């Protein structure tokens, strides 16, 4: 009645990149723009008109404000740019957890950045994230040069009390030539 088609897919073994790619494959190929959000994320009002204003015909991906953490008055504590608005056919999701978009297009990748769009994150603090450790280990097994997930794996070992593994992994993170983001480097030290 409202033009919505609901599809169901069970993903075993669970991986976030596989789930997102299956979801992406359900989107018609002639779709211009994909907007990927999670159930615990909410765009501020006016996001769609801002997207239509900012997006250009040759744009492949858009970075926008992401409030990962908010205080009790809904003011940002941790804010950064996130890039989960993208052209339909130019990307695939990679990494079993802390998944990211990887460009697979055949033309030049054109990324834009805007402050006109904001996505707020309202995490369910009761939700278990126990699968993250094994998924991060798998991610590093698949790509031992991925500095981002190497950092996250070291951090996850620390959260679980595996301090020697955490130290070894965070030292590996710091030794990667691609590990240049100052915030993650500082946290790994």
Describe the role of every protein-language-model region.
Residues 1-13:
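Acidic donor-binding segment of Leloir-type glycosyltransferases
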Residues 7, 35, 62:
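Conserved Rossmann-like nucleotide-binding pocket used by diverse enzymes
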Residues 25-44:
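Short beta-strand-to-loop acidic/aromatic patch adjacent to the donor-nucleotide binding site
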Residues 139-144, 174-188:
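Flexible helix-coil transition and linker loops at the boundaries of alpha-helical arrays
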Residues 151, 188-189:
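TPR/TPR-like alpha-solenoid signature
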Residues 18-24, 42-168:
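Catalytic-site signature of metal-activated, phosphate-bearing donor transferases
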């Amino acid at each position: 009645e409202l033009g919505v088609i609901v599809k169901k897919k069970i993903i075993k073994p669970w991986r976030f990149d596989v789930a997102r790619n299956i979801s992406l494959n359900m989107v018609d190929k002639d779709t211009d723009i994909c907007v990927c959000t999670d159930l615990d994320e909410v765009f501020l009002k006016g996001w769609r008109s801002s997207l239509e204003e900012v997006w250009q015909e040759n744009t492949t991906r858009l970075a926008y404000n992401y409030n990962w953490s908010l205080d009790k008055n809904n003011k940002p504590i941790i804010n950064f740019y996130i890039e989960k608005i993208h052209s339909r056919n130019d990307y695939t999701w990679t990494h079993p957890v802390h998944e990211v978009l990887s460009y697979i297009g055949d033309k030049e990748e054109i990324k834009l950045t805007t402050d006109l769009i904001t996505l707020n994150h309202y995490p369910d603090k009761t939700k278990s994230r126990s699968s993250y450790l094994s998924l991060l280990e798998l991610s590093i097994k698949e790509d031992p040069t991925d500095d981002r997930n190497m950092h996250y794996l070291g951090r996850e070992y620390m959260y679980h009390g595996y301090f020697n593994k955490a130290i070894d992994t965070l030292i590996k993170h710091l030794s990667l030539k691609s590990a240049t983001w100052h915030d993650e480097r500082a946290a790994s030290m």
